[in-house]
């Protein structure tokens, strides 16, 4: 212990006791560390012994498991050898069975072929019987479906027609009420104007007095009277687009009030000045108020404007009185009253209502949607003597609006001839849309070729076929459920050829009904007023509803093959064949 001094002994100047004390402390420290090391090594040995015992136990367990698995491997090897032997034996047996079954199948196929050859005659007889039965069933089902479809379409068409008729009648009554209100307001305005004219006439002197200028047509003419000022031509000559002038002249009185013209105060004034002044008047009521007959038998009278029927005699048109508009005083001129504004508002309302009426009329079903109905008053007048109270409506709508027949730029004429040609119509002139309500004829600006009907669609496809007639939804896009009977024929099951249903020898009555129904499509339907006689070019016997014809001669109207060919080649002459009652 003394031979191995510590690494850091005390210094040379230390005493022996200090050196000895330091060595003792070092010895004690090393002794304690040695005791701790012995304790820890003992614990480590115990843990290592435990680990060794545990490893030995695991080794014994793994050896036992390996022996067990070896026994299992030997068992599976034995089972595999046995299963392989059994599989080879079963495979040989199955191959023998397959060979036997193939021979049996070949024998059975030969027998089945012989049986099929023997059974062909019976199947042929059964097919003939089944085809005959199915042919009769298809014909019967087609007839039933056609009848049901036609009845349903007729019901739907009648309901739609009744609803639209009620709607159009209601709108027509509203138009009539507004017309009466406008007439009352115009009567009030006329009375006020006559009162104003009488007031002015009291202030005017004799025609030769110096109140008037010697040359009224000169542009610089002025009045010598301090109360009267003569308007110049530059002021009176308004443009064509002017609707109202500063002189609030009333319109002419209605047809029932036609009497002697108003007293001409200044009858010797030039006609040019009279024309320039009369151009700025409100629209006269001689044409646009009440419907005028074109040409009738000359044995009737002209009814009052409140009457619902106008079957008057010869065409009586009132020529508006050429009132001389004398120079007026600026102090006596009427201000812009509320009545003019109210009249303009009423006329605008009437135009809107007429537009609604035309929109409703455009939604009316055509003749293919509503069967033609024979009117009890259709043959009273011919098509050439059609009364002017009938509005001819075409599906093409080429004539424009019937609310205001002439553009608003046209001035109101002061001289209208009192007689018109027999086949023409009376144009209803108005100023800038300020027109009276009228159920008169539409202006047919073209010849009779414009109003001829288009060629029938049914004449090209149903001239020789008795297939189901096209429904009203066929040309107008309304979806319908597709029935088993299609538009061209019946689908025969089992792939057989179609029977003689579409090409049998029935009479042409069905085709003629279809052609008549399509012929009415291009004609002008005339929703006449209550009590107005309708005009029809030809006679339609019976109810006019297309019904299936029998094999024999039917009592309905027939269309020959030449008529069908003419309907295909081009439009025929004008024929107003569907002018039914609309009330």
Swiss-Prot record:
The keyword Disulfide bond does not apply. Residues 34-68, 211-339, 358-583 are annotated as: Disordered. It holds the Pfam family NUDE_C. One of its GO terms (molecular function) is microtubule binding. GO terms for cellular component: cytoplasm; kinesin complex; kinetochore; microtubule. The keyword Cytoplasm applies. Transmembrane segments: none annotated. Keywords: Coiled coil, Cytoplasm, Cytoskeleton, Microtubule, Transport. Residues 14-195 form a coiled coil. GO terms for biological process: centrosome localization; chromosome segregation; establishment of chromosome localization; establishment of mitotic spindle orientation; microtubule nucleation; vesicle transport along microtubule. Its main location: cytoplasm. Residues 219-235, 279-319, 329-339, 379-392, 399-422, 529-538 have a biased composition (Polar residues). Residues 453-469 have a biased composition (Low complexity). It is found in: Cytoplasm, Cytoskeleton. Residues 35-67 have a biased composition (Basic and acidic residues). Required for nuclear migration. Belongs to the nudE family. Self-associates. Interacts with PAC1. This is Nuclear distribution protein nudE homolog 1. It comes from Gibberella zeae (strain ATCC MYA-4620 / CBS 123657 / FGSC 9075 / NRRL 31084 / PH-1) (Wheat head blight fungus).
């Amino acid at each position: 212990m003394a031979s191995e001094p510590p690494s850091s002994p005390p210094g040379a100047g230390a005493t022996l006791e200090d050196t000895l004390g330091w060595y003792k402390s070092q010895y004690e420290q090393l002794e304690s560390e040695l005791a701790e090391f012995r304790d820890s090594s003992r614990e480590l040995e115990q843990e290592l012994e435990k680990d060794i015992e545990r490893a030995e136990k695991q080794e014994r367990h793994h050896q036992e498991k390996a022996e067990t698995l070896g026994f299992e491997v030997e068992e599976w090897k034995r089972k595999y050898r046995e299963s392989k032997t059994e599989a080879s034996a079963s495979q040989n047996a199955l191959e023998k069975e397959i060979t036997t079954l193939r021979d049996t199948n070949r024998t059975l196929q030969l027998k089945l072929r012989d049986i099929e050859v023997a059974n062909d005659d019976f199947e042929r007889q059964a097919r003939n019987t089944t085809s005959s039965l199915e042919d009769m069933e298809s014909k019967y089902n087609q007839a039933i479906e056609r009848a049901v479809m036609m009845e349903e379409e007729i019901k739907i068409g009648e309901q739609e027609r009744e609803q639209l008729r009620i709607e159009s009648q209601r709108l027509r009554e509203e138009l009539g009420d507004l017309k009466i209100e406008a007439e009352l307001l115009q009567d009030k305005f006329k009375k006020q104007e006559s009162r104003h004219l009488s007031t002015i006439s009291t202030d005017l002197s004799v025609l030769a007095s110096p109140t008037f200028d010697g040359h009224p047509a000169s542009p610089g003419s002025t009045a010598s009277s301090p109360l009267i000022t003569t308007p110049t031509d530059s002021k009176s000559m308004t443009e064509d687009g002017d609707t109202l002038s500063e002189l609030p002249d009333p319109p002419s009185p209605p047809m029932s009030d036609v009497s002697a013209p108003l007293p001409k105060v200044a009858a010797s004034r030039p006609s040019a000045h009279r024309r320039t002044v009369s151009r700025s008047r409100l629209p006269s009521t001689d044409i646009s108020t009440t419907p005028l007959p074109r040409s009738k038998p000359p044995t009737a009278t002209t009814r009052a404007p409140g009457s619902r029927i106008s079957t008057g005699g010869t065409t009586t048109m009132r020529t508006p009185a050429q009132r001389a508009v004398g120079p007026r005083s600026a102090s006596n001129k009427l201000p812009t009253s509320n009545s003019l504004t109210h009249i303009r508002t009423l006329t605008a309302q009437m135009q809107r209502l007429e537009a609604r009426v035309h929109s409703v009329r455009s939604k009316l079903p055509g003749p293919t949607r509503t069967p033609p109905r024979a009117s009890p008053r259709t043959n009273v007048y011919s098509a050439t003597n059609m009364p002017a109270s009938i509005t001819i409506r075409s599906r093409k709508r080429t004539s424009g609006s019937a609310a205001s027949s002439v553009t608003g730029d046209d001035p109101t004429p002061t001289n209208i001839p009192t007689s018109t040609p027999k086949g023409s119509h009376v144009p209803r002139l108005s100023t800038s849309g300020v027109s009276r309500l009228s159920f008169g004829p539409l202006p047919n600006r073209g010849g009779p070729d414009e109003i001829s009907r288009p060629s029938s669609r049914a004449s090209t496809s149903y001239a020789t076929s008795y297939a189901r007639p096209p429904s009203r939804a066929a040309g107008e896009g309304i979806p319908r459920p597709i029935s088993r009977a299609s538009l061209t024929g019946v689908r025969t099951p089992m792939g057989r050829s179609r029977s003689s249903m579409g090409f049998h020898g029935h009479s042409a009555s069905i085709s003629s009904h279809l052609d008549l129904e399509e012929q009415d499509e291009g004609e002008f339907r005339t929703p006449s007023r209550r009590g107005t006689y309708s005009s029809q070019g030809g006679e339609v016997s019976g109810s006019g509803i297309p019904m299936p014809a029998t094999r024999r001669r039917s009592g309905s109207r027939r269309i020959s093959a030449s008529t069908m060919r003419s309907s295909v080649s081009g439009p025929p002459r004008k024929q107003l064949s569907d002018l039914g009652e609309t009330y």
